[in-house]
């Protein structure tokens, strides 16, 4: 918390609703954004749209965590529609295991697709059985609560393989 507040002492001069609107990223979630927003309010006496990724109690959006991942799949569905097809039964490669990737995977599963891969900066996992809802819940807990590495998935699900230092784009899939 103290780091976020100290950071805002300098950053406040460079941001604003009409200037630049920072957002969370790797290692910076709603909690940290909340700390920074609180300090911004204290320094400026404003409650304006200066940060994205705030909690609901600070004026954040209800579906902010899901939005980008869901829209990825909405866009994909529109592309598939032009080819006269949809996601049902299609094998999908996903790069990443953070917020956007997690909710992309969730939406793919909801629409009948089969998620085959997820990754982090160390490597990727490929699950020949697919990453179902239960396995995705494990990944979400692993990444969001325990701050674990995707490699741990392969320890939990022995049929999955972990490939260190690589991206998943060379695995066979439909998407």
Descriptions of predicted regions:
Residues 1-88:
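Glycine/serine-rich phosphate-binding loop and adjoining beta1-alpha1 elements at the start
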Residues 52-55, 60-169:
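Glycine-rich phosphate/diphosphate-binding loop of Rossmann-like nucleotide-binding domains
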């Amino acid at each position: 918390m103290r780091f976020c507040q100290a950071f805002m002492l300098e950053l406040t001069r460079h941001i604003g609703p009409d200037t630049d609107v920072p957002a969370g990223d790797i290692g910076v979630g709603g909690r940290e954004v909340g700390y920074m927003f609180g300090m911004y309010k204290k320094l400026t006496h404003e409650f304006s749209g200066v940060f994205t990724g705030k909690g609901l109690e600070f004026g954040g959006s209800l579906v902010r965590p899901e939005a980008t991942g869901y829209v990825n799949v909405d866009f994909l569905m529109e592309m598939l529609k032009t080819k006269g097809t949809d996601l049902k039964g299609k094998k999908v490669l996903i790069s990443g295991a953070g917020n956007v990737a997690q909710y992309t995977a969730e939406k793919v599963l909801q629409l009948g697709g089969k998620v085959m891969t997820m990754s982090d900066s160390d490597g990727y996992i490929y699950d020949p059985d697919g990453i179902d809802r239960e396995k995705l819940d494990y990944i979400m807990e692993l990444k969001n609560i325990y701050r674990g590495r995707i490699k741990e998935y392969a320890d939990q699900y022995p049929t999955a393989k972990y490939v260190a230092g690589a991206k998943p784009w060379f695995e066979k899939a439909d998407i």
